[in-house]
């Protein structure tokens, strides 16, 4: 009887110990080297609130990488004609840099290259000032935009083979990297529907994958000369038909074979918003570092995070560094996002799922399991 009581007591103590023990956390640098956040750069008017957001929201959650979609929201000195009407000054940017440095956050500026040179009926700064760079100048800009349309117009592209385009673009790439004191640059390059069009006098009829790879490589080599990395979105490198992923998060226009033509030190930002697709394994096996990028579905974001950690842990040691981390994406302006974030606004059009909800959910889980 005495022996039975001792055994029972030991079981009770063990049970209580298991219930009260803290979850053994692992170093975040080991679990997820990149813990990112991607958002549009603020306007000058909202700079102070954005700095507060960095200090009070990003830093405590252990975000260590901030990709800022700057585009033409900067007072470029090298190409002043490409400035937006309301753009950040050098002094404004230095405040962002200081806030990031104080919180050990790596800041990476983004300017969309190749695609996304228009939006709906609005032509972007580059093609507005340099219409000769347009890949499809014969496509009329609609007064009232709708999708789908007969021209397959989503966003315009510049022609990567125009002899003057890089002499305009590379000075602003260098300038924005310099002012942000950045060792990397995000070139976008997602959702490129117009490329190698038959009517283009320079690239018509050419292999679209080779054109895409050529532009990636040209940008990469320019950055490498200054010891900077190139980051891009990964959708054009996935076969949308074979995978069933479609024309947005993958390619329908045969650019996917460029994955075997571009430098292996390009960092791939792999975005999938409705499913936890296993494409990080594809990119890692091709030799790239890959970052998974969710948007507005918290459960998908957490599933993707768990996949990334599992891939990293269970792969051969040569593969482990390729699984680089996670980056929450925001596709509204920073002002709209911060309003929605602080007021916890709901999105009735997406079953209540929001980008601020995904950000909270993802980083709550990241900080639960790591330190």
Show which residues each predicted segment covers.
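Secreted/extracellular small peptides and ectodomain modules produced from precursors
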Residues: 3, 16, 36, 198-201
């Amino acid at each position: 009887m005495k022996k039975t009581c001792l055994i029972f007591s030991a079981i009770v103590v063990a049970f209580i110990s298991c219930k009260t023990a803290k979850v053994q956390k692992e170093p975040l640098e080991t679990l997820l080297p990149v813990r990112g956040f991607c958002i549009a750069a603020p306007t000058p008017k909202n700079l102070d609130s954005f700095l507060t957001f960095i200090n009070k929201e990003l830093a405590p959650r252990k975000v260590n990488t901030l990709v800022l979609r700057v585009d033409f929201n900067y007072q470029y000195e090298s190409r002043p004609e490409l400035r937006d009407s309301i753009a950040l000054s050098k002094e404004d940017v230095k405040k962002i840099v200081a806030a990031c440095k104080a919180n050990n956050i790596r800041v990476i500026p983004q300017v969309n290259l190749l695609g996304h040179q228009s939006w709906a009926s609005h032509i972007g700064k580059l093609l507005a000032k340099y219409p000769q760079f347009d890949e499809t100048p014969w496509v009329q800009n609609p007064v009232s935009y709708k999708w789908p349309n007969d021209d397959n117009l989503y966003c315009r592209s510049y022609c990567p083979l125009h002899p003057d385009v890089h002499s305009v673009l590379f000075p602003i790439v260098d300038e924005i990297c310099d002012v942000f004191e950045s060792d990397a640059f995000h070139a976008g390059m997602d959702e490129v529907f117009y490329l190698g069009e038959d009517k283009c006098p320079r690239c018509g009829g050419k292999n679209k994958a080779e054109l895409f790879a050529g532009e990636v490589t040209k940008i990469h080599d320019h950055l490498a000369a200054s010891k900077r990395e190139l980051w891009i979105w990964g959708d054009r490198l996935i076969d949308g038909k074979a995978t069933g992923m479609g024309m947005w998060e993958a390619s329908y226009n045969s650019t996917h074979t460029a994955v075997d033509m571009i430098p292996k030190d390009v960092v791939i930002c792999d975005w999938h918003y409705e499913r936890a697709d296993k494409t990080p394994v594809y990119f890692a096996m091709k030799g790239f570092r890959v970052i998974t990028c969710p948007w507005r579905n918290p459960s998908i974001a957490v599933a993707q995070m768990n996949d990334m950690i599992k891939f990293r842990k269970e792969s051969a040691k040569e593969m482990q560094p390729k699984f680089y981390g996670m980056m929450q994406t925001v596709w509204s302006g920073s002002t709209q996002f911060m309003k929605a974030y602080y007021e916890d606004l709901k999105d009735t059009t997406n079953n209540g799922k929001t980008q601020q909800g995904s950000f909270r959910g993802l980083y709550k889980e990241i900080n639960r399991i790591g330190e």
